[in-house]
């Protein structure tokens, strides 16, 4: 399916596809699912940045008294700020950039899927519009034949079985017309729902012209290079590999610096607070976890690429078979045969 998506959206379209372009532009602006995905991506990207925030500053105040007789009262005020080793912020920032690139590609893939669904509905409507035109011709022929054989029956040139056969054909055509109308209405309603239930019209009867795909290798290279899912997995893999570096640097000490003021009944003193913590326990096995996750991401990327290539081969073969089947149809001959059949029935 994802390969069909890529092919369908990358195929160039000429003037008769302008109506489809207009529909897709409108849906891109008004589709609620797409708007929701954009906001979710925005939130996730900001969340990725929060991992690189400074920790909250700490403030403490102490008051203590001297035991025994005589005055004695002292206070202590400490304000400090903890921070990581400076290189950790640089590494985490690069990891967040890669993770956000993956999110952008995922959001673009959601957009692609939504627009493909809308494009398929447009193509369905084109088919239904073509069927409607053909059924109108069939209905007109059936009406004329029913009137003609009604007169022949009155003149004695036809029997009741022939007239009933014409009437049955006319009823069958009316049933197909009703089914076509229902299918058209359902497809158009689905298109309107994707457009946020805003008004939308689509009366196109011609399919967009497409560039014929002759060489599988060329198609494969183009699709793989532009496949958004593969691009997202590529950035996810790079982000996972960068996370290994982040976790390795988590072994660096956490630093702390601040201001300290002590006072008592006789004097006051100001000074600085400098300290740190060594992550002997909090970072255990995090590097191994990150390496396993990076390997998993790489394997997922390799598997996805293989799936893309296999699906492309199957789709290419199916496309070739459909092309041969379409070439077997002579549409002008079919319409000519319909006219000849109508003329033959009129002449008896």
Q: Can you say where each PLM-predicted feature lies in the sequence?
A:
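Sec-dependent signal peptide recognition
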Residues: 1-7
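Bacterial Sec-pathway N-terminal export signals of envelope proteins
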Residues: 15-58, 63, 83, 91, ...
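A glycine-/polar-enriched beta->alpha junction
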Residues: 29-35, 45-56, 77-95, 105-112, ...
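Amphipathic alpha-helical coiled-coil segments
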Residues: 36-48, 110, 114-137, 144, ...
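Solvent-exposed loop/turn segments connecting transmembrane beta-strands
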Residues: 40, 64-73, 236, 260-271
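Transmembrane beta-strand segments that form the barrel wall of outer-membrane beta-barrel proteins
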Residues: 57-67, 89-91, 252-263
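Periplasmic alpha-helical coiled-coil/stalk elements that build and connect Gram-negative outer-membrane
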Residues: 113-226, 315-322
């Amino acid at each position: 399916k994802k390969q069909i998506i890529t092919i369908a959206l990358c195929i160039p379209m000429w003037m008769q596809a302008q109506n489809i372009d207009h529909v897709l532009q409108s849906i891109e602006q008004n589709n609620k699912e797409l708007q929701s995905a954009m906001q979710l991506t925005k939130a996730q990207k900001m969340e990725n940045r929060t991992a690189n925030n400074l920790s909250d500053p700490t403030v403490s105040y102490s008051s203590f008294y001297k035991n025994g007789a005589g005055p004695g009262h002292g206070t202590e005020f400490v304000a400090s700020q903890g921070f990581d080793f400076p290189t950790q912020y640089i590494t985490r920032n690069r990891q967040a950039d890669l993770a956000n690139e993956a999110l952008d590609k995922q959001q673009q893939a959601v957009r692609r899927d939504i627009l493909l669904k809308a494009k398929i509905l447009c193509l369905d409507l084109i088919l239904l519009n073509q069927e409607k035109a053909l059924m109108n011709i069939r209905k007109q022929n059936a009406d004329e034949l029913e009137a003609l054989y009604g007169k022949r029956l009155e003149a004695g040139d036809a029997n009741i079985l022939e007239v009933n056969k014409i009437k049955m054909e006319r009823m069958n055509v009316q049933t197909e017309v009703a089914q076509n109308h229902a299918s058209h209405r359902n497809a158009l309603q689905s298109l309107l729902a994707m457009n946020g239930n805003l008004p939308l019209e689509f009366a196109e009867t011609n399919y967009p012209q497409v560039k014929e795909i002759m060489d599988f290798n060329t198609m494969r290279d183009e699709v793989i290079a532009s496949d958004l899912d593969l691009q997202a997995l590529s950035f996810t893999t790079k982000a996972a590999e960068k996370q290994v570096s982040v976790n390795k640097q988590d072994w660096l000490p956490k630093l702390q610096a601040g201001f300290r003021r002590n006072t008592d009944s006789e004097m006051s003193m100001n000074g600085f607070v400098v300290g740190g913590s060594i992550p002997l326990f909090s970072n255990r096995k995090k590097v191994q976890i990150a390496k396993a996750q990076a390997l998993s991401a790489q394997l997922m990327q390799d598997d996805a690429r293989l799936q893309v290539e296999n699906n492309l081969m199957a789709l290419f073969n199916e496309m070739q078979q459909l092309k041969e089947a379409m070439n077997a149809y002579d549409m002008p001959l079919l319409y000519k045969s319909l006219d000849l059949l109508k003329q033959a029935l009129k002449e008896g």
